[in-house]
Regions:
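ABC ATPase NBD coupling module
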Residues: 18-20, 74-90, 108, 116, ...
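The feature captures the beta-strand-to-loop junction immediately N-terminal to the Walker
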Residues: 42-44
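Conserved ABC transporter NBD signature motif
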Residues: 65-73
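Conserved ABC ATPase signature
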Residues: 148-152, 156
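A short, surface-exposed alpha-helical micro-motif characterized by mixed small hydrophobic
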Residues: 214-216
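ABC ATPase "signature
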Residues: 232-233
Length: 356
């Protein structure tokens, strides 16, 4: 059964520039969400990801197209109907800190849910419901109840907000960049929580710019560019056999940090710079960052396998071989293969992005 359906949704914003023209944020976006699945909505900044989340949460009105929930157009909801809609469709956002008033205890967000949706529930029953919801997000109620926001970690705050959604009998969770402000270990906890909730029948829209996170958590993936869907399908298929050039470009930029660099047999050295083939002997091979405009190494995955850094090097790259001789610069396309004797492992601090 389809829980939520987006059908040919477009959204135009009026530009603030002189002339006040219309700027498209979404272009005929269509997809369906069903119970018990995670859909990753992936794209660069400005691709329209957050706009889709706002449309689903009735925070933005589509210029054209419809969004239906259990067969009913959400634009038709008002009053009690809209209140019921928000009971079943909830959002959790990038910055958990902004959802709390620092002068009140963090669990006050549950009091607001109670007064709006469960005013007749007694104190004891409500406390049991709150503790059950907090347990469901892998937190100990004794560790978080009664605490102020500044006394909780970002991960605890985010999970408390997910627990608030669970109190409402939520069916669809819009998770907009919810782990981008969390540290690495906490990210895994929240991702695993989403997988657990999916198993309990929750439909989750996981909005992210990070393909590796989407690959980890989702059943289906939507790739968005300039407000339009360029590719959509099973996550394994999208990541394993991408069809659109934009998807391929995004995937080549993903660092595979789980892969350890080893002295495994590789093909013989073959370097082509500006169309000229050139063989390199068994010398030192390095990958360095470069601030030179246009310098780029086509096979950036080599850097990803050589470094254990958690951050992607933001500068363009160039290949430098024996004696510091650059074989790639400008707009040249380079294919690189290295023999094991030519490989040397460097500590992460040898591969550091230049200061911005």
């Amino acid at each position: 059964m389809t829980t939520l359906k987006v059908d040919q949704v477009s959204k135009l914003y009026r530009s603030s520039a002189r002339g006040g023209g219309l700027t498209p944020a979404l272009r005929k976006v269509s997809f369906e969400m069903k119970p018990g699945e995670v859909i990753s909505l992936i794209g660069e900044s400005g691709s329209g990801k957050t706009t889709i989340g706002k449309v689903l949460l009735r925070l933005a009105k589509p210029t054209s197209g419809t969004v239906t929930f259990d067969g009913k157009d959400i634009a038709s909801y008002s009053g009690r109907g809209l209140k019921d809609y928000y009971r079943h469709v909830q959002g959790v956002f990038q910055d958990p800190f902004s959802s709390y008033n620092p002068i009140y205890r963090a669990d006050r967000v549950y009091d607001l849910v109670r007064s709006s949706y469960f005013p007749k529930v007694g104190d004891r029953e409500w406390s049991e419901k709150v503790e059950a919801a907090i347990d469901a997000v892998a937190l100990n109620p004794a560790d978080v109840l009664g605490k102020y926001p500044h006394q909780l970690s970002g991960g605890q705050q985010q999970r408390l907000l997910i627990a608030r959604a669970l109190l409402l009998d939520v069916k669809v969770l819009v998770a907009d960049e919810i782990i981008s402000m969390l540290d690495a270990s906490t990210r895994v906890d929240v991702l695993n929580l989403l997988v657990k909730l999916k198993g309990q029948g929750l439909a989750i829209l996981f909005i992210t710019h990070d393909l590796s996170l989407g690959n980890y958590v989702s059943d289906r993936t939507i790739i968005l560019r300039h407000g339009a869907i360029v590719e959509m399908g099973a996550t394994g298929k999208i990541f394993g056999n991408p069809q659109h050039d934009y998807t391929k470009m995004l995937l080549t930029a993903v660092p595979e940090l789980h892969k350890k660099w080893q002295h495994a047999p590789l093909a013989p050295v073959a370097v082509s710079a500006n169309g000229a083939g050139e063989g390199l002997g068994a010398g030192t091979a390095e990958l360095l960052t470069s601030s030179a405009p246009g310098s780029r190494l086509a096979q950036a995955s080599i850097l990803e396998e050589l470094t254990h850094a958690e951050q992607v090097v933001k500068r363009d790259l160039r290949a430098v071989f024996g004696g510091g001789r650059a074989v790639a610069s400008g707009k040249s396309q380079v294919a690189v293969a290295l023999e094991p004797p030519a490989l040397h492992e460097f500590e992460p601090d040898h591969l550091v992005a230049e200061p911005e």
